Amino acid sequence: MNIIAIMGPHGVFYKDEPIKELESALVAQGFQIIWPQNSVDLLKFIEHNPRICGVIFDWDEYSLDLCSDINQLNEYLPLYAFINTHSTMDVSVQDMRMALWFFEYALGQAEDIAIRMRQYTDEYLDNIIPPFTKALFTYVKERKYTFCTPGHMGGTAYQKSPVGCLFYDFFGGNTLKADVSISVTELGSLLDHTGPHLEAEEYIARTFGAEQSYIVTNGTSTSNKIVGMYAAPSGSTLLIDRNCHKSLAHLLMMNDVVPVWLKPTRNALGILGGIPRREFTRDSIEEKVAATTQAQWPVHAVITNSTYDGLLYNTDWIKQTLDVPSIHFDSAWVPYTHFHPIYQGKSGMSGERVAGKVIFETQSTHKMLAALSQASLIHIKGEYDEEAFNEAFMMHTTTSPSYPIVASVETAAAMLRGNPGKRLINRSVERALHFRKEVQRLREESDGWFFDIWQPPQVDEAECWPVAPGEEWHGFNDADADHMFLDPVKVTILTPGMDEQGNMSEEGIPAALVAKFLDERGIVVEKTGPYNLLFLFSIGIDKTKAMGLLRGLTEFKRSYDLNLRIKNMLPDLYAEDPDFYRNMRIQDLAQGIHKLIRKHDLPGLMLRAFDTLPEMIMTPHQAWQRQIKGEVETIALEQLVGRVSANMILPYPPGVPLLMPGEMLTKESRTVLDFLLMLCSVGQHYPGFETDIHGAKQDEDGVYRVRVLKMAG
């Protein structure tokens, strides 16, 4: 970062000459100089080039107005105002809090001024780099000799092998030098929360509005288990969202607890809804506890916020209403909610402490922010036993954590501080809103069909749109007022074939075809439903990527309307089974799958499958104990009714468990099996469209098989 912008005076000799001298002196200090044409040009430079590390300008011409505009973009950026002996200095105490320095126009002073600007630049960089990352950078620059782990010794070992050299050249020297051992004492300890690691966690807590934060280097799957192992002791009961991530199902297998399920809603599109308000009431919980063997009043609750499809809760209401001492919001998909006003009251860390309760929030920093994969955070607000919690933390944390991951978590937090962070999140929200409007415009202008978006009819302003009762667009029956809200950065595209109420048309385009078309053109969909596709507008999505997605959608429409051959339109799919797809065209394939979906009434089947829960014969923990003792056998999926599942069975999409370990399908919940068999049949009819079902495996004959507990006797 070495770019300085100069807004020089124009045509004034006694000002021009000192600035020309200064330019030469700054270049000698290693700076690169740019000359914006005017203040508008300058602000665009700063907005789109974060490597700018200073601005020089004439105070008489631009004064505080320019400073204020720059501060709206980056209040930390050094500003250098040049004045003469007659300049008016109307600067308040508040203005002096800016990173603003004054210099006089004078010949022969350029070298000294350039040295001072180098000093101020170094202070600026030192100020924006967070503590652990700063310490890691310093350590790498020191190039110390070590005789400890890791064995590649800062990348040296890779350069002793041809293939190692390829690896080194790809990842780069600094990445490998930053992969250091816990034996480096000056970097502190992640496990003991000392030194720069502790400073990083305190820095992150301040940034995210938490009282305490913990850095986790192996994903929110692990963060969820850490919280659960601390908050739900053996023999206790916990309330848990049936929409939970599979890591929480694994927690239930590890920990000897009794789950009581909070049952969420779904709409006909297969979009995951939230848990209705009535489920959080004391009366409802009492009924659930009474109906569950071994259950007591729950000590802990787990709620997925937001849902996979981008629905956020009114978390303030839940925190006040839910009568349990410990609440965990699994917010893996929304680590940005603290940094934009539209999300106020919709995150775990929002608001003040709640008397008598401790609130946990887990976030996948890597999912929607700028952190490396596996980067995760646990935030806490309320009283808790730090020593006991840290035992749970250490139980699930490697003694060789990745320091680049730690630095990336901290840097992700640093990127969100101040006006630069607000602007980063706001840009993401605005880009998603613009994309939504563009799809609407193309739909209105297109001949025939075009894609639609799952959203209210009018989306003029950026907000979290309420899923309000009585509105048709969302498709949720009996929606609660002021309870669920659609996140604008989670964009669900709808394909023709079915409306939000589940009414199916004669013809349709299953979303899986569109997903394959986009994938073959380098555009990866986050989630695919029967007639919907989910796209995430994270902070890394720029205008080019958004336009690329729009282009992909319009290209699909054009190719579909031309009824191109599968061989030409979807060559990768064609390669799956050339004989089957040899003469098939895209409209034949679309209508074939659409008719299969209509025949089996997939939307209705999906709703019924998730609405009727299987019978819990034993807890997931008890079922797991039986499995590791070898008391299991494998049967065909179609034989599952009446047998106790040994594993979690989870079709993707939608990625939510249908059957938990220890649960049994009965005559009442038979629809779960019908739904699974229907998903399997699509792949049997059309090669390349097989459904991924976690917990079920295909044998050599193509039969899906599952593990169940052996029957007694």
Question: Across the structure, where does each feature detected by a protein language model lie?
Answer:
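Conserved PLP-enzyme active-site core in the AAT-like
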Residues: 36-45, 58, 68, 220-440
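Short, structured coil segments at secondary-structure junctions
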Residues: 29, 75, 95-98, 255-256, ...
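Non-catalytic terminal extensions of PLP-dependent enzymes
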Residues: 13-30, 39-57, 70, 76-77, ...
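Short beta-alpha junction loops
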Residues: 10-12, 60-61, 82-89, 108-109, ...
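Extreme N-terminal starter segment of soluble prokaryotic enzymes
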Residues: 1-3
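A short, gly/pro- and small-residue-rich
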Residues: 64-87, 378-380
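Long, structured ligand/cofactor-binding scaffold of large enzymes
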Residues: 163-254, 260
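Hydrophobic or amphipathic alpha-helical targeting/insertion segments
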Residues: 72, 80-97, 101, 109-110, ...
